[in-house]
């Protein structure tokens, strides 16, 4: 595991701005309103030659444990315990506040290695705050400006000995580990081209849904620990939080997204940023888990979210949460399946699983459904099998003959995976009705065991494959005309 640095401090001192600078991307929401970041967010940081993991945390606040701020504080304390070092930020322009003093005392008593950073230190207005920071007893403060990139060399110098010491310890542990030989069969055939998730490219799963459907609670259950802030308040999650996890040796990166509401209801500037962040997470994901509330399933916004995931070409799993609160489970399940088939025909056959994020029931079913959806999304069908299948489908139900012209479906191949995409070479592709395309897509789903995954089917004329079609025949230049054809004898 890489060296981990947690950025902590009270709200609005510039933690997310510094996080974005270290990661090199705009991953965290940034606003001048305190308390924008509410969860733990991880990123791969680059600072000069240094490479490490950085955690952006919720703002430290003095608050009762039952309040939202109290839960944010507990989550931050957890990040400090997980990290190899933490960078405690204060606002140099404001100076040291009583809240800074309280949390500096907490950090001094912790076992963590603490660096002190005085952010927003650009300009003369920050000089007094920089001097005040010495009184916190955390060593010499680093004068930083996350917004303008100032002080990064000093931060590099402070982190370098910590990371070097960490890597020496890691290398010593690796050298002591036993070696394992893996025998490879040179005659083994590669039957599929399915990409197996790796640490560098893990399986990417996004959990989406309306506000307060239980997305963060669900992810905490899958992780086996409280990494995301949860509570009864709707809209607690404001960023698309990305977390790494391991499913029985399979590397997975899971995205918790802000709840998506109708555009008319998304008025606050921060919520608009959060929802667009969630939409971006859907585009990055391979499998999208659409989380419904069992009490009010398949609301209009649920249908929009599921349709968006399908149009983006993602594998989709429907998960119905709060199942522990249902009394007539059999009757409710039958009702859900009927509504699913009626309201989301474009996702016909996609997995529908019932879960309880609160109690942890159904987590194994959900995980199996995600892995199955991913496998189908990556599936490739041999060309010979496709063309035998196409012949049988045409024989059973020939395409129509508009205007007396018989349409011939000559050849079929799979052009892509993720999601599966097929091309049929035919005559008059523009004349093939949508109903016949649906007939073929439904047949592909059923006969090649591809339930629920988006399938793209394109009808193409054989002449479309000719790159020289509609190109004018080149005429000889005046010089060639004058010289005539070159003699073969030279």
From Swiss-Prot:
InterPro entries listed in its UniProt record: G_ENGA, GTP-bd, GTPase_Der, KH_dom-like, KH_dom-like_a/b, P-loop_NTPase, Small_GTP-bd
User: Pfam families this protein is in?
Assistant: KH_dom-like (PF14714), MMR_HSR1 (PF01926)
Residues reported to bind GTP 1: 9-16, 56-60, 119-122
- Which residues take part in binding GTP 2? 209-216, 256-260, 321-324
Q: Which GO MF terms does the UniProt record name?
A: GTP binding
Annotated KH-like domain residues? 379-465
Instruction: Please state every residue range assigned to the domain named EngA-type G.
Output: 3-167, 203-378
PROSITE patterns of this UniProt entry?
A: G_ENGA
Q: Where is this region: Disordered?
A: 451-490
Composition-biased stretches, type Basic residues, lie in 469-484
Q: Which UniProt keywords apply?
A: GTP-binding, Nucleotide-binding, Repeat, Ribosome biogenesis
Name a single GO biological process: ribosome biogenesis
Q: Which Gene3D superfamilies match?
A: 3.30.300.20, P-loop containing nucleotide triphosphate hydrolases
Q: What does this protein do?
A: GTPase that plays an essential role in the late steps of ribosome biogenesis.
Q: How does it assemble?
A: Associates with the 50S ribosomal subunit.
Please report which protein family the annotation says this sequence is part of: Belongs to the TRAFAC class TrmE-Era-EngA-EngB-Septin-like GTPase superfamily. EngA (Der) GTPase family.
Know the name of this protein? GTPase Der
- Protein's organism: Dinoroseobacter shibae (strain DSM 16493 / NCIMB 14021 / DFL 12)
């Amino acid at each position: 595991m890489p060296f981990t640095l947690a950025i902590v401090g009270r709200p609005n001192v510039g933690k997310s701005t510094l996080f974005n600078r270290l990661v090199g991307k705009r991953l965290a929401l940034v606003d001048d309103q305190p308390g924008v970041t509410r969860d733990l967010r991880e990123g791969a940081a680059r600072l000069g030659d240094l490479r490490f993991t950085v955690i952006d945390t919720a703002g430290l606040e003095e608050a009762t444990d039952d309040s939202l701020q109290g839960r944010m504080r507990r989550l931050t304390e957890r990040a400090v315990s997980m990290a190899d070092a933490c960078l405690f930020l204060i606002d140099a322009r404001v100076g040291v506040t009583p809240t800074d003093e309280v949390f500096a005392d907490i950090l001094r008593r912790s076992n963590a290695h603490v660096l002190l950073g005085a952010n927003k230190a650009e300009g003369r207005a920050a000089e007094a705050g920089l001097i005040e920071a010495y009184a916190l007893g955390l060593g010499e403060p680093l004068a930083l400006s996350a917004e303008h990139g100032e002080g990064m060399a000093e931060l590099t110098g402070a982190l370098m000995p910590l990371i070097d010491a960490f890597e020496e310890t890691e290398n010593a542990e690796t050298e002591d580990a036993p070696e394992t030989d893996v025998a490879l069969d040179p005659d083994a055939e590669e039957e599929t081209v399915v990409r197996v998730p790796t640490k560098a490219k893990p399986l990417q799963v996004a959990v989406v849904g309306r506000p307060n459907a239980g997305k963060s609670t669900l992810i905490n259950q899958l992780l086996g620990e409280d990494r995301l802030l949860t509570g009864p308040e709707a809209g607690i999650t404001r960023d698309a939080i990305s977390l790494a996890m391991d499913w029985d040796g399979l590397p997975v990166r899971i995205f918790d997204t802000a709840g998506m509401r109708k555009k008319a209801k998304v008025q606050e500037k921060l919520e608009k940023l959060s929802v667009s962040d969630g939409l971006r997470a859907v585009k990055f994901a391979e499998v999208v888990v659409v989380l419904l509330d069992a009490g009010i399933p398949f609301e209009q916004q649920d249908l929009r979210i599921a349709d968006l995931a399908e149009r983006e070409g993602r594998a989709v799993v429907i998960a119905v949460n709060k199942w522990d609160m249902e009394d007539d489970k059999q009757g409710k399940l039958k009702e859900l399946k009927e509504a699913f088939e009626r309201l989301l025909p474009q996702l016909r056959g996609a997995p529908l699983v019932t879960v309880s994020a609160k109690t942890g029931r159904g987590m194994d079913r959900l995980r199996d459904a995600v892995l199955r959806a991913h496998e189908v999304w990556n599936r490739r069908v041999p060309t010979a099998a496709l063309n035998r299948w196409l012949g049988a489908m045409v024989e059973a139900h020939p395409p129509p003959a508009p205007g007396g012209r018989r349409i011939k479906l000559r050849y079929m191949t799979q052009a892509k995976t993720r999601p599966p995409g097929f091309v049929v070479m035919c005559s008059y592709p523009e004349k093939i009705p949508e109903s016949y395309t649906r007939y073929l897509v439904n047949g592909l789903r059923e006969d090649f065991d591809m339930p629920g995954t988006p399938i793209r089917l394109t009808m193409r004329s054989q002449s479309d494959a000719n790159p020289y079609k509609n190109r004018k025949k080149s005429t000889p230049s005046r010089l060639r005309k004058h010289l005539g054809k070159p003699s073969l004898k030279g």
